[in-house]
């Protein structure tokens, strides 16, 4: 494959797999059973995704080597009018993307819950690129998968191989955070709040090479929906796997944790207070990740109780998102009839976080999911979003007067600053790191943009300007354009490489990238587009280089030299 004998598409994929292996320090490759590819919606993949898929077209040998499924699209194409999407050529662009993936031999399941599709439980090695699915499957099933990006999963799908690294290695599958629960957790939304809360406690000084991997003690027995809600929201902050005493397999014994935290009744109450709706709710969205049959039935039960009082939902103020598989199941048991009779809109093939909302109608959403809230409030949609249990969500869908007043304003919200351990450095600094096999030699110099906090590309880096737009982040308001960008690794959505590729295509990307940690969210874009990329330094550049320093980087014989030419005077 590397020599191009199997076509240019598989050659590109093989080069990327080799680059990932080199970066991860993998000494061998593993055969992979199946893959799940993210980056489907027009608003997530954007220009970078469409151009990349276009570049792959026309190669008859460029089809996947293993069974591969596809993540959620940005709409239910049968209900475009009801969704009111106001986005030029959205449906045409969406069809183009899905068709391009289908041409690669990928099954267009259009679901972000590949673990909930009625097939026998999968095991072995997978290459999955939907963050909630990665965390769910590693935690509750026998499938082993690293937290792949959309591009790294696609490369493995095309080749059938992945580097053996990360969670493929048993010794790396152990907890690094201990979480003690000291409150009742009775509602599914409580579990969603918990997963997100854990991520918010992470300190930059904690050594979490594979991401936060908590062991949680003190939780009661859990339904499928509770377990799903926990792993989905934990994945907001890069969690690829977790353990829950009495629910998952026993956690390996560790002698010390990077952090030990306690979640109390006061913490749960405070988060609900912070997340409660302030101002009129315009739309209720349930199903992020796409709703299970159990979630649909719970929603229908709450809806039926209001219907029996003679109430109806006006203007389709409740949207329930599902996979096509689960949609078919509820259409056969009466659940769909109840929801639609009440006035709810039940959608398939899409998800709340990847849908472009019509802002002439919807400026304040209510959901039961912290995963939805995390991405809906980001730059992806930048729409104020509140959180409550399903029964409260349904109440707001029926009665738009429960909370009065204007929609909340995200611009006016005060974000808690991210924890950072960076201090200003004045001493001379030079370090040696490594490049990637697909890059032979380069030299760059320029202004450094540096943080010790991971960067979340999807939703928090403006795909048009390259400006980081994440309140509380140390680099909030800074542009990555034409910088030497130095940071630990990417975080958040596995669609990150397509956002970065789009910025590089349009001239708003960095001139070079330095990662401290192994980063399958960043490396693929650099590998495929030839952006100078360095990693594995003998000293941590995220602490030793200041934003504003003049820096030189050079690659020769696989080694990268990083030199601070002059220090910034700004502190």
Language-model segments: what does each one mean?
Residues 1-419, 424-426, 470, 491:
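Non-transmembrane, aqueous-exposed alpha-helical and coiled segments at domain scale
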Residues 304-379, 428-444, 448-561:
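Feature captures the catalytic cores and cofactor-binding loops of soluble hydro-lyases/lyases
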Residues 402-432, 437, 555-559, 563-571:
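Intein/HINT protein-splicing elements and their conserved insertion hotspots or analogous self-processing inserts
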């Amino acid at each position: 494959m590397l020599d191009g004998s199997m076509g240019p598409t598989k050659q590109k994929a093989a080069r990327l797999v080799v680059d990932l292996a080199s970066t991860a320090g993998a000494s061998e490759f593993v055969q992979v059973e199946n893959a799940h590819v993210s980056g489907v919606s027009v608003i997530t993949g954007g220009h970078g995704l469409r151009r990349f898929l276009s570049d792959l077209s026309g190669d008859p040998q460029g089809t996947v080597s293993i069974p591969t499924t596809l993540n959620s699209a940005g709409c239910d194409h049968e209900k475009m009018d009801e969704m009111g999407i106001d986005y030029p050529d959205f449906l045409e662009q969406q069809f183009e993307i899905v068709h391009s993936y289908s041409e690669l031999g990928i099954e267009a399941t259009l679901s972000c819950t590949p673990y909930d599709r009625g097939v026998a439980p999968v095991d072995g090695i997978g290459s999955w690129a939907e963050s909630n699915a990665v965390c769910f499957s590693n935690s509750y099933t026998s499938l082993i998968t690293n937290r792949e990006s959309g591009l790294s999963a696609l490369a493995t799908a095309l080749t059938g191989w992945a580097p053996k690294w990360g969670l493929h290695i048993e010794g790396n599958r152990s907890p690094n955070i201990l979480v003690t629960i000291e409150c009742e957790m009775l509602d599914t939304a409580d579990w969603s709040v918990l997963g997100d809360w854990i991520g918010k406690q992470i300190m930059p000084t904690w050594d979490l090479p594979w991401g936060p991997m908590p062991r949680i003690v003190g939780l009661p027995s859990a339904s499928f929906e509770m377990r799903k809600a926990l792993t989905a929201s934990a994945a907001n902050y890069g969690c690829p796997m977790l353990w829950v005493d009495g629910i998952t397999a026993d956690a390996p014994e560790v002698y010390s944790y990077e952090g030990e935290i306690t979640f109390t009744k006061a913490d749960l109450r405070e988060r609900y207070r912070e997340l409660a709706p302030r101002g009129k709710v315009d739309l209720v969205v349930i199903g992020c990740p796409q709703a299970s049959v159990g979630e649909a039935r719970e929603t229908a039960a709450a809806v039926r109780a209001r219907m029996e009082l003679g109430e109806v939902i006006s203007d389709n103020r409740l949207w329930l998102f599902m996979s096509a598989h689960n949609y078919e199941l509820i259409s056969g048991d009466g659940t769909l009839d109840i929801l639609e009779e009440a006035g709810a809109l039940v959608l398939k093939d899409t998800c709340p976080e990847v849908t472009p909302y019509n802002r002439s109608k919807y400026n304040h959403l209510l959901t039961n999911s912290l995963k939805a809230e995390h991405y809906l409030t980001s730059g992806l949609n930048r729409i104020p979003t509140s959180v409550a249990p399903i029964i409260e969500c349904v109440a707001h869908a029926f009665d738009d007067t429960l909370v009065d007043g204007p929609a909340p304003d995200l611009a006016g919200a005060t974000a808690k600053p991210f924890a950072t351990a960076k201090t200003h450095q004045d001493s001379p600094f030079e370090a040696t790191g490594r490049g990637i096999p697909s890059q032979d030699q380069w030299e760059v110099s320029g202004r450094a943009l540096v943080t010790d906090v991971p960067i979340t590309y999807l939703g928090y880096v403006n795909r048009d300007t390259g400006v980081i737009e994440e309140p509380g982040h140390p680099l909030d308001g800074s542009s990555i354009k034409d910088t030497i960008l130095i940071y630990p690794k990417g975080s958040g959505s596995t669609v990150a490489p397509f956002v970065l590729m789009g910025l590089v295509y349009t001239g708003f990307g960095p001139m070079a990238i330095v990662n401290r940690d192994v980063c399958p969210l960043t490396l693929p874009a650099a590998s495929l587009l030839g952006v100078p990329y360095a990693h594995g330094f003998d000293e941590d550049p995220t602490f030793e280089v200041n934003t504003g320093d003049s820096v030189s980087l050079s690659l020769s014989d696989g080694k990268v030299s990083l030199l601070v030419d002059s220090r910034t005077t700004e502190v």
